[in-house]
């Protein structure tokens, strides 16, 4: 935890892309130029009213924003304690928060004259969102995806192909999200002249952590205004799942300077942190460099990245966005591990009480919100980011429960 309290969280990152001791730009010399070009283009675009207007128009008419806040009354009664509210990002076009970011980056790619976009994906939602905006803007799209994730997310793989994208299986390493990101980086280095890399989470070298955060920050801005309009006050606590952490930082950002709002991130504890089969980078990791930024990573005593595990492909990543590492160290946010079993139980409870199938990623946040609600009085408000819908996970859940579909 930082020695001195931080009065303004919006002062970060600094000009070099650092969130305290985290973040930065640790990349090969060949990527310095492209990253500088991207940073300059983004800083120019975000100050351009016409770019902002185009982005806002797409969020409204294409994505379907604003997404509502739903009071999960039956779930709240079943759990006891505080009232659980759901920010319904699962209702967005493509079924998750990911399109908030891909729309912004794809518009930036077109503005920069790029004709080819590449992306990495774990659960497949970012791949689907990237393929979707590529089709809309007439851009070529390649999506790198770990072979392990392809097996557990066949529906999203086919969705990407239906949208015209090429899906490249990655078999190196653990054949999951980190390996897909590695391969996408290699592609970008080779084809930087005509290619734009749409990173799906708040990781990577600067400017990606702040750019992806900014494009997802609509979630928190909406939620803050909706809470004040519908409930006359801010929530007592907010919760979101954290792998890389894009949906979480999207919700958290609008509340960072509100000390009365407690912030919680749900990491993937897998089979339990003590077993070593997890993906809880903050709870069980240590500072290191991964994919171009300094953050908390899961590694061995020699600093080598180790394999992770989560039932959720989107959380199965051995690092976390540098802003989350910073928020944890500063004490502003608390990150807790949620096991596979806890996420599964939350998935079923939400389905049975509210008729909502949450993504396995989002189910980690639902499980955390249930725990928080049980510790708070009945009039307290817990806002949970329901970052995606669970259609993509039906086969995974059935297989875990011994059912063949």
UniProtKB/Swiss-Prot annotation:
GO MF: tryptophan synthase activity
Enzyme Commission no: 4.2.1.20
Chemical reaction(s) catalysed: (1S,2R)-1-C-(indol-3-yl)glycerol 3-phosphate + L-serine = D-glyceraldehyde 3-phosphate + L-tryptophan + H2O
Pathway assignment: Amino-acid biosynthesis; L-tryptophan biosynthesis; L-tryptophan from chorismate: step 5/5
Pfam families: PALP (PF00291)
Matches recorded under InterPro entries: Trp_synth_b_CS, Trp_synth_beta, Trp_synth_beta/beta-like, TrpB-like_PALP, TrpB-like_PALP_sf
Key words of the record: Amino-acid biosynthesis, Aromatic amino acid biosynthesis, Lyase, Pyridoxal phosphate, Tryptophan biosynthesis
Gene3D superfamilies given in the database record: 3.40.50.1100
Cofactor: pyridoxal 5'-phosphate
CDD domains attached to this UniProt entry: Trp-synth_B
SUPFAM superfamilies: Tryptophan synthase beta subunit-like PLP-dependent enzymes
The family this protein is said to belong to: Belongs to the TrpB family.
PANTHER family, sorted: TRYPTOPHAN SYNTHASE (PTHR48077:SF3), TRYPTOPHAN SYNTHASE-RELATED (PTHR48077)
Quaternary structure and interacting proteins, as annotated: Tetramer of two alpha and two beta chains.
Protein name: Tryptophan synthase beta chain
Organism: Xanthomonas oryzae pv. oryzae (strain PXO99A)
